[in-house]
Amino acid sequence: MITDASTLKSLNDYISRRIQEIPLEIKETFLETKKVWKCENELDFLYGYYVGKIEEATLHYLLKSTRASAGGYVDTFEIRGIIEEQRDALQNAIKTGLK
């Protein structure tokens, strides 16, 4: 469990910065999502994709910033919870990228 307030703030800031990059990334990368992955709902697909991508990057950032070993226990559900706290911003960023 992440108990250090400065680490938690740093993770929130990192996730916020990462979310701000998403619209440009979508415009440059995901040209025909429905054709490539044959998904029904593009917004839902990209939401799941970015939650996973941000979760992985945040875990890497956390391990790097705290100099923790990869063998140490880090609760990925806690990281996902931090991401979900910003779900509205994430959904808005994806919608902006899809316009």
Give the ranges of each region predicted by the language model.
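Short terminal alpha-helical segments
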Residues: 1-34
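A generic structural signal for well-ordered alpha-helical segments enriched in polar/charged residues
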Residues: 17, 56, 60, 89-92
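Long, hydrophobic, amphipathic alpha-helical segments used as structural scaffolds
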Residues: 22-26, 30, 34, 58-69, ...
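Amphipathic alpha-helical segments that form the core helices of the histone-fold
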Residues: 36-39
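Amphipathic protein-protein interaction modules
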Residues: 41-81
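Amphipathic alpha-helical binding modules
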Residues: 69-99
